[in-house]
Amino acid sequence: MAEEQAYHVSKGLECLKALRENPPDIEEIQEVSSLRDQTCNPGQENGTTGMQEEEDSQNLDESHEPTKGSNYVGHVPQNNPGCGERNTALVEAERPPREDIQPGPGIRCDHVYDHSGEEVKGIEDADSLVVPAGTVGNRGFERGEGSLDDSTEDSGEDYSEGNASSNWGYSFGLKPDRAADVSMLMEEELSALLRTSRNVGIQKRDGKTLQFPHNPEVRQGIRSVDPLKRGTEERSVSHGMGIVAGSTSGATQSALKSTGGSSEPSVSAGNVRQPAMNAKMTQKCKLESGTQLPPRTSNEAESDSEYDDELFSEIQEIRSAITKLTEDNQAILTKLDTLLLLKGETDSIKKQISKQNIAISTIEGHLSSIMIAIPGFGKDTGDPTANVDINPELRPIIGRDSGRPLAEVLKQPASSRGNRKDSGITLGSKGQLLRDLQLKPIDKESSSAIGYKPKDTAPSKAVLASLIRSSRVDQSHKHNMLALLKNIKGDDNLNEFYQMVKSITHA
């Protein structure tokens, strides 16, 4: 803490030296001072408020008075707007009697102490530096006069009104000719000192001026006519201050800086957001604690109704979309169930096919050991049925025992044929099949698998009608031919009709 105090003191000394060497233009100083007076002293017109602030400042000063000697040790608030911290430094100054307080010709920095009471080293120039200061007016140290009896006044009173310079902290209720820390001088005191130094004849160097930063705007609150009730002996309901809302835009007004002193350690308030000057109203305020809302215009009502209609239509669209998605999901689930059923049926079909393959392989094994007798094979050449055409695709299948089936179908068994060698029959002669085992000769005049021979019989006419129906002829022609078929009599006429139908269907 001592290093910070020494740093601020050295910076203040450098600033004052620069001002003494390069004084600013008097016209610019007067212009800045007039602007500062207009913005920072609106509360001086109210005498009651000024007196109340003086009494409060005096109460604070008297609460810090020592019990010994005429020296006064107090806290000088140091405001650092950049980091939001408040530093205090112990000040030792001579305090003359209250009735003999007069503004001195200047302010002299004599000694600087830290919080532990030790003197700060390394600032020897502060003892010899004298800064001229004129009459400051109703600024700085003149604002602290009052009586000790006023300190019992209610502490809940609002001290944020009046002079804007009070927002920078409390000032002492005396008019000393010494100051403990040069860097603690307020902007108003610097302006007054520079104006006084200009009046005493300090020359100005061309092209070098001093620019003062603007004091942040402080919006004055509207005091209620009926103050809030103070503490009573019984519990009661408080209805608030009844403050009328000054802005309906929804922006939070910047709070006035507290003027009360604090003996507790300072706390950093970094990353504090700046107050919003204007913001869009987001919700309707409730008529509570005396807050009044402005009447709604017709345009606002129409915009709200349009907004409600658009919101309702959007909700309906979202609902319909959700319904459509639900239906699609239901259809997909139904198809999935169908696929599961088809999968089960496919598995059963595969099992049946495997069973049929096993049965077919079994039949093929049996067929390999069976001999199929072909009609006409082994017949005598003199037999009239021996000239029947044989299907060339049919071949005799011989089993494992090639001699056994032949001996069973021949006219004479093999045993009898082998014993009769003297009869002139050799073993290599062609055997004859038994007549009972021979097929009857095929009648070429009757219908068979070889060909169709129409006759005036019901089965023959039924076969012919089936041929007509299965043909690709128009329906009208089919009806005509079926009608003619019913009226035809005789084998010859039926044969001619058959030839005609064959020519029409194969055309």
UniProtKB/Swiss-Prot annotation:
Biased composition (Acidic residues): 147-160
Name of the featured protein: Phosphoprotein
Taxonomic lineage of the native organism: Viruses, Riboviria, Orthornavirae, Negarnaviricota, Haploviricotina
Cross-referenced CDD domains: MEV_P-protein-C_like
GO molecular function, one term: RNA-directed RNA polymerase activity
Keywords, sorted A to Z: Coiled coil, Phosphoprotein, Viral RNA replication
Residue ranges, annotated region (Interaction with the nucleocapsid (N-RNA)): 459-507
Family (UniProt): Belongs to the morbillivirus P protein family.
GO BP annotations listed: DNA-templated transcription; viral genome replication
Polar residues bias spans: 31-51, 246-271, 289-300
Organism: Canine distemper virus (strain Onderstepoort)
Coiled coil: 310-339
Modified how: Phosphorylation on serines by host CK2 is necessary for the formation of viral factories.
Span list, region Disordered: 31-86, 123-172, 242-307
Record comment regarding domains: The N-terminus consists of a long intrinsically disordered tail. The central part contains the coiled-coil multimerization domain (PMD). Forms a four-stranded coiled coil structure. The C-terminus constitutes the alpha-helical domain that binds to the nucleocapsid (N-RNA complex).
